[in-house]
Regions:
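Small cysteine-rich, disulfide-bonded extracellular modules of the LU/uPAR three-finger superfamily
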Residues: 1-99, 105-111, 194-235
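Beta-strand-rich, repetitive solenoid scaffolds
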Residues: 22-23, 101-106, 161-164, 172-174
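Small/polar beta-strand repeat architecture
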Residues: 111-195
């Protein structure tokens, strides 16, 4: 795996956790996700990363990436070493191709749900997705598939908040709450409601796209260390 880089957002959040008492992420909700893009970087937003994530086809799913323990301080190398995370992906029904892997804290297991313009009610401002599993307050980003146009009132690259949930449909609010989003038309084609809970911790970009053939797997071993820059021994 290429060297991982912390995002600016995670560095800021870490400072708030360490020195201002902000709530740390749930240790069971770290997940590794994949994107077939080489253009994501440390300044990109959560919405940028989530909008680029692979679709849940050919068996793609976010991989659990939880630490098995606290790790130990390595006196020789002068750094605290956390247990290595193992995250695996497997292709089925077709290949998977990606170039960037990114770690999400406080994430949902589901990456995205698909729906079409026929599932959008511009009168009630509701989106119908059978057994969607979202709950009030969950964050979503919407994208349109090729040749599709998002419903009026929903903007690509914008994080929305799920509201007025039932088992099979929901409304939207602006991120952080507020009035129900007014859906002015149903749009056209197929869309994706992409899960945007959490924060992007770190990412790694491969030098060229990686293809996981149908029926095969690919594993990431993710080492994470904490150190004082300039004092560590080794690499």
């Amino acid at each position: 795996m290429p060297t991982g880089i912390f995002t600016n957002a995670w560095i800021t959040q870490s400072a708030k956790i360490l020195f201002r008492g902000s709530t740390p992420p749930d240790s069971t909700k770290f997940r590794l996700a994949l994107a077939n893009s080489a253009s994501l970087g440390r300044t990109n937003s959560l919405a940028d990363f989530i909008s680029s994530e692979l679709l849940p086809t050919n068996n793609y799913a976010r991989a659990a990436a939880s630490f098995s323990g606290d790790g130990t301080y390595e006196t020789t190398d002068q750094r605290h070493e956390l247990p290595v995370i193992s995250a695996s992906f497997s292709a089925s029904g077709g290949s998977l191709q990606f170039q960037t892997a990114f770690l999400i804290a406080d994430s949902l297991a589901v990456s995205s749900k698909s729906f079409t313009n026929s599932n959008v009610n511009a009168t009630t401002d509701r989106i119908a997705i059978t057994s969607h599993s979202f709950v009030n307050g969950d964050k979503l980003v919407f994208t349109a598939d090729a040749l599709a146009t998002l419903p009026g009132g929903i903007t690509a690259g914008t994080i929305y908040q799920v509201a007025s949930v039932t088992t099979d449909d929901f409304q939207l609010q602006p991120n952080g709450g507020g009035s129900t989003v007014n859906i002015t038309d149903t749009g056209s084609g197929t869309f994706r409601a992409r899960s945007a809970n959490g924060i992007i911790v770190a990412y790694a970009v491969e030098s060229s796209p990686i293809t996981v053939p149908d029926g095969q797997g690919y594993s990431y071993q993710i080492p994470l260390v904490v150190l004082n820059s300039g004092y560590v021994t080794g690499s």
